[in-house]
């Protein structure tokens, strides 16, 4: 899953 700070891998 894409987060604000980058890709969290989920």
Curated annotation (Swiss-Prot):
Enzyme type, top EC level: oxidoreductase
EC number, as in UniProt: 1.10.3.1
Family: Belongs to the tyrosinase family.
Quaternary organization: Homodimer.
Post-translational modifications: Glycosylated.
Keywords (A to Z) from UniProt: Copper, Metal-binding, Oxidoreductase
Textual note on the cofactor: Binds 2 copper ions per subunit.
Name used for this protein in its record: Polyphenol oxidase
GO molecular-function term, one example from the UniProt record: catechol oxidase activity
Swiss-Prot/TrEMBL catalytic activity: 2 catechol + O2 = 2 1,2-benzoquinone + 2 H2O
Tissue: Expressed in the rhizome. Not detected in leaves.
Cofactor(s) demanded: Cu(2+)
Domain of life: Eukaryota
pH dependence (record): Optimum pH is 4.5. Active from pH 3.0 to 8.0. The activity decreases sharply above pH 7.5.
Notes on temperature effects: Optimum temperature is 60 degrees Celsius. There is only a slight decrease in activity at 75 degrees Celsius and a sharp decrease in activity at 90 degrees Celsius.
Function (record text): Catalyzes the oxidation of mono- and o-diphenols to o-diquinones.
Keyword Metal-binding found: yes
